[in-house]
Amino acid sequence: MKKILAALLTVATVITCAFAFTACDKKGGGATEKIKMVDVDLSSEQYAFIVKKGDTKLLNTVNGILDAKATEIQAIMDKYLNATEDQLATFGSNSIKTSATDGANELVVATNIDFAPFEYYNGNKIAGIDIEIAQLIANEMGKTLVVEHMDFDAVVTSVQNIDKYDIGMAALTISADRAKMVNFTKPYFDTTQV
């Protein structure tokens, strides 16, 4: 009885496979001709930087720099987003400080350096869109850039609760929940999932 059942299952499997392969045959008008790609945005997000609630001076300063340096910021984005893997491997700076020592003269950034091309380690160098924009902002403010790496989930709460962090930069999506804890700068990047 087991041999008969096994033989019947084998025959059923072969027949099913034959129909499946026939359905996929492009010449035979199979299922592949019925598939249509539709270019529809499923979700869109904006990335922005964050500052502590109530720090309107820093928020306005950063927003002003984002406006004034829009051309340079776009060039930074183009550099990274159009780069090959080999080119990405050449970017970055090993002269960026990674721990704060003089808060008044430093722009201290809380980030997670694990999201290329926005933030990433290139050997012992720190690179990425956010890092270069942070350097631009620090230069405009006349401050030394300090970048502190932490878990992604800690970036928002660190800016919210720890005074040494001036700004959070980690390809942060603008969301209502985060906006309850921190202030978002103007968006600097739009992304869409299709």
Question: Each predicted region: which residue ranges?
Answer:
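Acidic, polar ligand-binding/catalytic clefts
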Residues: T32-S43, Q135, N139, T144-V194
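C-terminal motif of bacterial Sec signal peptides marking the signal peptidase cleavage site
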Residues: F19-A23
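Hydrophobic/proline-rich hinge and linker segments of small-molecule sensing/allosteric domains
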Residues: F49-K53, E106-I113, F184-V194
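Short glycine-rich His-centered loop
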Residues: D86-A89, A104-G128
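Bacterial signal peptide processing site
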Residues: D25-K27
